[in-house]
Amino acid sequence: MKLSLYYSPWCPFCIRVLNTIKKMSVDVDLRDTGSRAHSSALKKGGGKTQVPCLLVEKAGEEKWLYESGDIIQFLKVL
């Protein structure tokens, strides 16, 4: 399973998720949407540019999680 977090460094909800990732030592690819490439990939893949967004890739399937609470809950059950 591959995890990628689309985030903005100024977003308080993103900071909450980032702190959880750091605390739990989860291996997540961080993608700052300040980069045009990451912002475009988020819109193309997930359909919107809302952050935070966790992309979960497993067995050829993609799942896009957008709410910080949902993302944190998902990470806690890994």
Map each language-model feature to its residues.
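GST-like domain detector, emphasizing the conserved glutathione-binding G-site
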Residues: 1-9, 15-78
